[in-house]
Design a protein with these regions (language model features):
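Compact, charge-rich alpha-helical regulatory domains located at protein termini
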Residues: 1-66
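P-loop NTPase motor core
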Residues: 110, 187-280
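Charged, alpha-helix-enriched surfaces in structured cytosolic catalytic cores
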Residues: 13, 46, 85, 101, ...
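Conserved, well-folded catalytic cores of nucleic-acid-processing
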Residues: 54, 58, 93-97, 109, ...
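Phosphate-binding/switch region of NTP-binding enzymes
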Residues: 234-238, 242-338
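The Walker A/P-loop phosphate-binding site
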Residues: 17, 36, 40, 51-167, ...
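Conserved inter-motif catalytic segment of the P-loop NTP-binding fold
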Residues: 133-230
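Hydrophobic/aromatic beta-strand patches that form the interior of the parallel beta-sheet core
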Residues: 104, 139-141, 183-185, 256, ...
């Protein structure tokens, strides 16, 4: 049975535009390009994307057996899978590494190492499971134009050298394979990013070996350009977060997003840096890690986790894969704590 557009919580203006122009069911929306919907209905691209993300996310569940379930043991097995960060200390702080089926956010100022960590994770996802990898592939969504293939080659080269030393008989590990297994998609504006996220379920079905999705960064196209229409921005971000969380859970993959920092004024002559995109976005992420500078040293703080205590780690970025991100563990109160 086709689900009617009337059954969704849409503004009267959007609902009228859709129905009066022949878009009466989910299928009418899901199988048409955003540009065509805008041309037919007169909706702005942002409005059409908002509708598309909501109806396709719900429609993906249609036809499934609502009584299907997993046992507690199966869920425990799924949630016990982690992707190594290549640093034993950071993995320990996180409880094993980057968890699957969760939305993980890495925040920090420019130059602190967010992109470096993103690329490292893309390579790590291809490592055999006995070395903390996922035996899979990765998708990197680049919004800032900061992807440089030479940096990925350097990390892949270190990974290959590391694996060859650990197990000379290991197969299917080559530079060509490492690069082919990282699917890169560049998004030039936020509407393109939203469209890519909307189409991710289909892409994952076609590329079933993908075990990691990285968005670097989630905030780049959302910091400006909304003309103070922050309610629209919040709706789009929340819809995007819900889609990513759903993907992580249904496809048993790791989802990592990077975020920038912004200045918060807390007094006449006092301010400090906080993650961009506001509190609503922060509540959507399962885990939040903040990278920052202090006394010319890099620090990382695990600020939010449902099962781990807050911890601060001093780190430096080095060359070798088995020490690509060298962390020194310390426990103290975070400067970002409430």
């Amino acid at each position: 049975m086709l689900r009617s557009i009337d059954s969704y919580l849409l503004s009267p203006h959007v609902r009228y535009r859709l129905i009066s122009n022949g878009y009466t069911t989910v299928e009418d929306i899901a199988h048409n390009p955003v540009e065509e919907i805008c041309e037919d209905t007169g909706l702005f691209k942002e409005e059409a994307l908002d509708v598309l993300m909501n109806v396709t996310a719900d429609n993906e569940d249609s036809g499934r057996n609502v009584l299907s379930s997993n046992t507690a043991f199966q869920l425990l097995q799924q949630e016990s899978l982690y992707l190594t960060t290549t640093c034993h200390k950071l993995d320990d702080v996180l409880g094993g590494g980057i968890p699957l089926m969760k939305l993980v956010e890495i925040c920090g100022s420019p130059g602190i190492g967010k992109t470096q960590m993103s690329l490292q994770l893309c390579i790590n996802s291809q490592l055999p499971k006995q070395y903390g990898g996922l035996d899979g592939e990765a998708m990197l969504i680049d919004t800032e134009g900061s992807f440089v293939v030479e940096r990925l080659i350097d990390i892949a080269s270190a990974a290959i050298n590391f694996l060859s030393l650990q197990d000379p008989k290991i197969q299917n590990i080559s530079m060509d394979n490492m690069l082919k297994n990282v699917h890169v998609r560049q998004c030039k504006d936020y509407s393109e990013l939203l469209a890519v996220i909307t189409l991710l379920p289909e892409f994952l079905r076609e590329h079933s070996k993908i075990r990691l999705i990285v968005i670097d960064s989630i905030s780049f196209h959302f910091r400006y350009g909304f003309d103070k229409n922050y309610s629209l921005r919040t709706r789009l971000l929340c819809g995007m977060a819900q889609s990513l969380i759903k993907l992580a859970s249904e496809y048993n993959i790791a989802v990592v997003v990077t975020n920038q920092m912004t200045t918060k004024i807390i007094g006449p002559n006092k301010s400090h840096l906080i993650p961009s995109l506001g509190e609503s976005w922060g509540h959507m992420c399962t885990i939040r890690i903040i990278l920052y500078w202090k006394e010319n040293k890099r620090w990382a703080v695990l600020l939010k986790s449902p099962w781990r205590e807050e911890a601060i780690i001093q780190f430096q970025i080095t060359v070798l894969l088995n020490n690509q991100l060298s962390f020194h563990l310390q426990f103290r109160k975070s400067p970002f704590s409430a």
